[in-house]
Amino acid sequence: MEKAVKIRVPHVDERPLWDVFFGVWGYPAVFVAHELKLLELLSEKPLGLEEIAAAKGLARRPAEALLAVCASIGLIRLRGGRFSLTPLAQEYMLPSSPTYFGWMFDAWRLIYSVWSPDSLRDAVLSNKPQGVFSDPAGPFASWHAEHAADFTRAMHSASIGPAMVWPLKVDLAKHRVMLDVGGGSGAHSIGAVMLRPKLKAIVLDQAPICALAGEFAEKYGVADRVSTHPADFFEDPYPEADLHFYGMIFHDWPPERCQFFARKSFDSLPPGGRIVIHEMLFNDNRTGPFPVAAFNVDMLVAVPGQQYSKRELSAMLKDAGFRKIEVKPTFGYWSIVTGVKP
């Protein structure tokens, strides 16, 4: 007869595990609320549960379930029996907002199956991107060709908020032309020229993406100061600029490719020129924080790259020849790593 298992009062509770586990439903709930335009409905006026359910043709129970998740993460609040939007939702979840985040949900809906446990397991065992990301022509190549606009809008959603903050965290007074390498929609160029009136920007990306960047520049009223330059950032020379910006570019690539970017910028910039890398950074031990660790899993499934620590990116810039290297938290989970060419 086997010995009885001894049990004791646990030393710690299991809340962190439940937080991860319940995230399986949290993201889809917010996505469905977004898809059903529940938040847009509440932008018109505060409404009660029954009014919301009736307006969207929902039974009370599912309407309440979605609203509860949205309220729990701070998108809506309940006062006097009526739900209304919080500043978080007004800033990021309404299409009319210049810092709209909803395109991230829309684009990831197209490839949501890629982030299944099976897909992640395959990525872990093979150390290779999965699904639509496994194209031999490069990460995202075939999917990107078909869904370039979707992806560009998604990256714009992720970038435009922090783009309105980081240019205030670093001295750009002496700089006149910013090269936005792999700049996508040009969100960071838009933010930089809006906040720094003496600055102009060039978005360097593939030709179809440059066309979209031009549309965004028009939309934000900065087309006279944000231009585009269709090019391959590996093969083609960089146009003249005294400020190089890389927003979510380094994390797409392994260290040797990132070192290539750092050296290419060092060789291209004039003395006094500056490089700025904009990423979510690991701590120096690469053990957190959790959002960055989770983002790193995204990179594992999607690209050959990874999230980096401030120590790793600083070392890359130093090895390339940059000096006056600084790391500055900017907005939310974002930071910049910056250096100057002597």
Give the role of each language-model region.
Residues 4-8, 14-46, 54-55, 61-176:
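Conserved Class I S-adenosyl-L-methionine-dependent methyltransferase catalytic core
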Residues 2-78, 172, 177-342:
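Alpha-helical subdomain
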